[in-house]
């Protein structure tokens, strides 16, 4: 299996989202479950298809000041108002490194979206820095999580609210409530969706997923971008298209009326 390169890159993913991952791969997620988060990590499956070892986390860095300047120039030129950290890895695996990268790109005044499972917890100092920069943190969670993981994610989602924009990114399923497990998970899911500033993210399982095979979650084929994909959709109107037409913008739209902070605080 190939190992990811440590050179940080600003790339547009298949849905049109500009990503600047500070880490790629996810040792924490695959150590907790060999199948990844929710027992079926889409990013891990995609990496495997491309021949990459997703179980090894690789930090991505600026190779030089010239490389850093190149990334900043490219960021300033993209038409989108935000950049996302946490597309093919979880930035929480090394918050210190992630915040150093954010410190470098904050002058672009792009909204910074972080997608995380909070494998490592932010310190109060780190939260104060993020508050000064102005970021939007998406905490990814699901009824598929264990109670321990779900409680950790919910606690962090609430903990960061006084510091920066906090979004609960709920990975949802069409649970079969005629089963005991499906009914229990559906109830948990409704509780998660009742929180404020929630994004409904459709679960994309594999055919071999145990919950699919046992009938606990219902699946269907749906058009996802330009192809057909197996999905489990609680909300049949959930958006599966290109970033450009999405109204939520990974949570940035919830706080669009707020001005971006102008910061002089440095992270070190």
Spans of model-derived segments:
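Conserved AdoMet/S-adenosylmethionine-binding subsite of the radical SAM
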Residues: 66-227, 231
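Short microdomains enriched in Cys/His and/or Lys/Arg
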Residues: 52-71, 266-268
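Canonical Radical SAM [4Fe-4S] cluster-binding loop centered on the CxxxCxxC motif
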Residues: 2-62, 243-256
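C-terminal accessory extensions appended to soluble enzyme cores
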Residues: 1-9, 194-268
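A sequence-composition feature that detects small, non-aromatic residues
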Residues: 32, 43-47, 66-69, 104, ...
């Amino acid at each position: 299996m190939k190992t990811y390169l440590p050179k940080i890159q600003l790339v547009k993913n298949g849905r049109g989202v500009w990503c600047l991952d500070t880490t790629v791969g996810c040792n924490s997620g695959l150590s907790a479950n060999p199948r990844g988060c929710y027992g079926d990590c889409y990013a891990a499956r995609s990496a495997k298809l491309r021949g990459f070892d997703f179980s090894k986390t690789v930090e991505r860095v600026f190779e030089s000041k010239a490389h850093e300047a190149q990334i900043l120039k490219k960021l300033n030129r993209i038409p989108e108002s935000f950049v996302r950290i946490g597309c093919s890895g979880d930035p929480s695996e090394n918050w210190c490194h992630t915040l150093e990268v954010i410190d470098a790109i904050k002058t672009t005044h792009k909204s910074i979206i972080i997608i995380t499972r909070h494998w490592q917890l932010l310190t109060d100092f780190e939260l104060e820095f993020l508050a000064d920069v102005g970021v939007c943190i998406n905490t990814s969670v699901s009824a598929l999580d264990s109670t321990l993981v779900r409680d950790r994610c919910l606690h962090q989602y609430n903990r960061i609210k006084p510091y920066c924009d906090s979004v609960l990114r709920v990975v949802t399923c069409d649970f079969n409530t005629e089963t005991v497990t499906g009914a229990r998970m559906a109830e948990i899911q409704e509780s998660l969706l009742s929180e404020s500033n929630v994004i409904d993210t459709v679960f994309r399982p594999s055919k071999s997923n145990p919950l699919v095979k046992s009938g606990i979650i219902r699946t269907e084929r749906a058009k996802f971008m330009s192809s057909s994909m197996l999905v489990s959709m609680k909300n049949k109107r959930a958006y599966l298209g290109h970033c450009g037409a999405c109204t939520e913008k990974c949570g940035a739209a919830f706080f669009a009326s707020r001005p971006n902070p102008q910061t002089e605080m440095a992270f070190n």
